Regions:
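A short, highly charged nucleic-acid-interacting micro-segment common to nuclease
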Residues: 36-47, 125-128
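N-terminal low-structure segments adjacent to metalloprotease catalytic domains
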Residues: 1-34
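Long, well-structured alpha-helical subdomains associated
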Residues: 141-197
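Catalytic Zn2+-binding segment of zinc metalloproteases
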Residues: 110-130, 134-143
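Catalytic zinc-binding patch centered on the HExxH motif and its immediate surroundings
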Residues: 60-92
C-alpha cells in the first residue's frame, strides 16, 4: 500500500521501514520534500530516508516545496540544483541527485537552494566554493560522509577521515572571517594546506 507521510519537525523516526514511499509530499505542514516520478522509482527507500534526514538541517526550506529529482548514474554530475534567476518564489525549488549519493552532496545541493532563496537573509554568497563551506557547517560531524568537491586540496581529500573535524571547524571560522574580510575562501584553503604539514 502506498500512503502519504506527514512529518513534524521534532519527529525522531521520520519514515518507517515498512512504508513504501512515492512522490507524495513528505512534509512540514503543507511544505517539504517531494520526489519526482523518476526519483521515486530509482531511489531506494533508504536513500529517500537519508534525504529527509539531511533536509531536517535546513529549517529555512521547511516552508518551501522542494522537488528532488534523479540524475542518471552514468553522468559525471553527482548532484545539481535547478535555479532560474527569474523563477517565482511560489514555484517549487528543485535539486537532482544520483542514486545513493553521499550526505555531503545532498547538503551541498540544499545549500544551493539557500543561496537562491535566502541569500540576503543568511548572507550566503553565491558560488560552488562558498556553497561547500556553508554546507560543512550545516551537518553534524557524524553525518559528513564525504569531502567537499570544490574547496580544499588532494591531501585534504586523501586524509579526510582524520582531518574532517578540523576542516569543519575551519569552515565555521571562515564564515566569521567573511564578516570583516572578503578573502575568507583563500584564508580557509591556506589553513587546510597547513593540515597536511
Amino acid at each position: 500500500m502506498i500512503r502519504r507521510l506527514d512529518f513534524i519537525n521534532s519527529s525522531p523516526g521520520l519514515i518507517d521501514d515498512d512504508v513504501e514511499m512515492r512522490s507524495d509530499l513528505l512534509s512540514y505542514g503543507t511544505c517539504g520534500v517531494r520526489f519526482t516520478k523518476k526519483a521515486n522509482v530509482n531511489f531506494t527507500n533508504e536513500f529517500k530516508k537519508r534525504i529527509i534526514e539531511i533536509f531536517k538541517y535546513f529549517p529555512e526550506l521547511h516552508n518551501e516545496i522542494v522537488l528532488v529529482g534523479w540524475i542518471t548514474p552514468r553522468g559525471w554530475a553527482r548532484g545539481s540544483c535547478c535555479l532560474c534567476s527569474n523563477a517565482s518564489a511560489s514555484k517549487p525549488l528543485k535539486i537532482s541527485l544520483q542514486p545513493n549519493e553521499k550526505n555531503f552532496t545532498i547538503a551541498h545541493e540544499f545549500t544551493h537552494l539557500l543561496q537562491a532563496r535566502r541569500k540576503e537573509e543568511l548572507q550566503i554568497p553565491s558560488g560552488e566554493r562558498a556553497c561547500d563551506i556553508w554546507a560543512l557547517t550545516r551537518l553534524p560531524l557524524e553525518l559528513i560522509d564525504d569531502y567537499p568537491s570544490y574547496i580544499g586540496n588532494y591531501l585534504m581529500r586523501k586524509r579526510w577521515g582524520t582531518v574532517k573535524k578540523r576542516v569543519r571547524e575551519l569552515a565555521f571560522n571562515a564564515i566569521e572571517i567573511r564578516k570583516t574580510k572578503r578573502q575568507y575562501i583563500a584564508w580557509f584553503e591556506d589553513e587546510v594546506k597547513k593540515l597536511a604539514k
